């Protein structure tokens, strides 16, 4: 009955989930928002830095566990915004060293596909459109494969730039 923490910090959200044998026990998170414009990576990273310990305590409380019960900690290693990813990685290393537990790096895109597989989707295909990344990804022949990707402006960057020019905030 492995008890796993998962740390998400790829962009606007800092979150910590707690899972035991496929059952979600907690999903605590805080989202960086702006009133005007898109995500400012350093501001999002500051948001994560300021909230990480509170989110951690909230996740443990929501799951009804003590940190000493945690068997391993996973974290999103990318893709994502480098300053935000760094906060999540450092936090993960800190907790893992404190608890003397293993770290499991996770690819954010693959995690989305795995959720599809875990929930019973047969051969899930994903259009991943986030920031500079726009890819068509699927599981085929025993591997995750990229079947296509943009060679110029990513859909996420296009949407961010449009929102900035239109004066739309990020919420």
Write out the residue ranges for each language-model feature.
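Short acidic/glycine-rich loops and adjacent helix/strand connectors
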Residues: 1-171
């Amino acid at each position: 009955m492995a008890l796993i923490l998962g740390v998400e910090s790829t962009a606007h959200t800092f979150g910590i989930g707690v899972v035991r044998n496929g059952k979600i026990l907690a999903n605590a998170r805080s989202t960086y928002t702006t009133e005007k414009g898109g995500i400012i990576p350093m501001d999002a990273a500051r948001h994560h830095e300021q909230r990480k310990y509170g989110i951690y305590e909230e996740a443990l409380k929501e799951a009804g566990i003590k940190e000493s019960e945690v068997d391993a900690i996973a974290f999103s290693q990318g893709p994502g915004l480098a300053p935000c990813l760094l906060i999540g990685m450092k936090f993960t290393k800190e907790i893992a060293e404190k608890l003397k537990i293993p770290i499991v790096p996770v690819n954010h895109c693959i995690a989305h596909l795995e959720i599809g597989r875990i929930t019973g989707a047969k051969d899930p295909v994903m259009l991943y459109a986030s920031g500079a990344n726009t890819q068509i990804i699927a599981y085929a022949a025993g591997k995750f494969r990229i079947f296509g990707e943009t060679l110029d402006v990513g859909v996420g960057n296009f949407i961010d730039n449009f929102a900035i020019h239109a004066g739309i905030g990020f919420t």
